[in-house]
Amino acid sequence: MSKEAVQQRIEELRDLLNTFNYQYHVLDNPSVSDAEYDRNMQELIKLETENPEFITEDSPSVRVGGAVLDIFEKVTHKSPMLSLGNAFNEGDLRDFDRRVRQGIDGVNVRYICELKIDGLAVSLHYEKGRFIQGSTRGDGITGEDITQNLKTIKAIPLRLQEEVTLEVRGEAYMPKRSFVKLNEEKEQNGEAVFANPRNAAAGSLRQLDPKIAAKRNLSMFVYGLADIEGKTITSHSEALDFLGELGFKTNPNRRICETIEEVIAYVEEWQEKRPNLDYEIDGIVIKVDDVTLQERLGTTAKSPRWAIAYKFPAEEVVTRLTGIELSVGRTGVVTPTAELEPVRVAGTIVRRASLHNEDLIREKDIRIGDYVVVKKAGDIIPEVVNVVFDKRTGKEEAYHMPTHCPTCDSGLVRLEEEVALRCINPACPAQIREGLIHFVSRNAMNIDGLGERVITQLFEANYIRTFADLYGLTKDQLLQLDRFGEKSASNLVQAIEASKENSLERLLFGLGIRHVGAKAARTLAEHFETMDNLVKAGEEELKAINEIGEKMAQSIVTYFDNEDVLHLIQQFKDYGVNMTYKGIKRADLQNIASYFAGKTVVLTGKLEVMGRSEAKKKIEALGGKVTGSVSKSTDLVIAGEAAGSKLAQAEKHNIEIWNEERFLQELNK
């Protein structure tokens, strides 16, 4: 592959993985299997490793999770809620053990093993023993404030046995018996049932009415101590024992293992015992027990090096494939999906499974009428593993992908170096609808309340056909749609109006220009500052910008060399949509009259004059970056009253420390 082709593929993989992360971690509505996600991630990691010049800070390969919903207030975690690396077999566990021992130079190590609860990760904050705030994991950096819903969980103490200030992490879950009862009630009421206990727990905690969560009989296991003031903890097992003494519910099935053989035995034991539990688990978490060794091993941007999650193999069942359905995405990619005779897999009824592309169908020789093996990778997303050839009768029908789009009947093409078939008709209704869904999404124009269901209704009612049509919607039109009342219609009109003020990069990303992801959109917006400047740019000018390759430059020029696009931009202007970049330019950071420009800052302790969130906003507005933990890259620690371990770490590493008074003096310069 040429460098341009490599860069193009990397951008496509990043966009794809960001979408998958958003669907899985934020919407609780995954669209692909773990296996497909892992294949794409491994391809991205391989390409980035071989082409380090294309590695970016916001690549899914170094980032945790995806974006946060706007239903609840946003909460920035004091320290990131990192995800864990995965192990799928004994060899992966032994590799983990080898890496750990190499990282600590042969020092004796012991592990602590815990059941991996399949629920919703949450963070709980206590001040002087009182529960003051609880939040979801979100994207690992920012979560949602769900304090009132968490207070309904009886396993969460509202007051601890000691007046300590701390932050703990845990997993909120729904017991199996509660899940069965809830779905029976929903079926009786004619309501849609939850797919699994994890979705039920997540859905319950995202209800705006705490009374609903209170009826759901949720529970929670605390699995870690993120921060504590005035106490030194030397091991993870000590932390769990201490948390149990404070009144938290910790899982009793944890075990200290002196060797990796003992770890493997523990994994095998609980793989057998798993069905006997009254809650879902999807694996085993293995951690280095000693905190000092954890610190020596450190973390990557995505996960700690001292812990790993062993994922149980997925349950496999056999069912009949009755048909293949096609869907068209916003870029014209046509994706086949298997239609199955309903079968129960990992606790839920499965009727459909992704087949990904024509090559996979051909490689696995999948035919209509075949009996196929189906599993839920990660116990979540259905996929066809293989065909049961012994069950073939000769009546099965070979499947051939169509030559024309199933939506608009235009001819399909396979572009060079792609496995997917594409519809290249820009007027294809399916592409327009999917493009509209992308335009309003979180990383684009971020219009709250305008999701896939509403877009589909608006599209089918012929109220919208272009992005600009959204800004001409009226409350009266919305009131004609299903499930819209006066308040919801007014709220959506206000949300659409508010999106006009977005910075240029969101609009550029929302337009869906081929090869232009969220990062490239920001780079373009920052460089050109206005839409008009970008529209006038030539290919050579674009290629001169760092991170903009030849393929992307060609795509941008081609996109804006279209009368329909220019008309769309004029419509945006007529509706008052912002066309300028509102962020701080990197080139201007050095001119900001502030110490903070380009610096990494950590806030700790209580600030009297302003809260930490306000201080964070001020620092970031002045070009600084605020993180939740002290590291070698930290330039400054601002310490308020009752500053804890972060202050001690700063002193240990000779990092500059300010009190609040010094901080305020700098702000007032």
Curated annotation (Swiss-Prot):
HAMAP family: DNA_ligase_A (MF_01588). NCBIfam families: dnlj, PRK07956.1. This is DNA ligase. The lineage of its organism: Bacteria, Bacillati, Bacillota, Bacilli, Bacillales. GO terms for biological process: DNA repair; DNA replication. GO terms for cellular component: cytosol. GO terms for molecular function: DNA binding; DNA ligase (NAD+) activity; metal ion binding. Its cofactor is Mg(2+); Mn(2+).
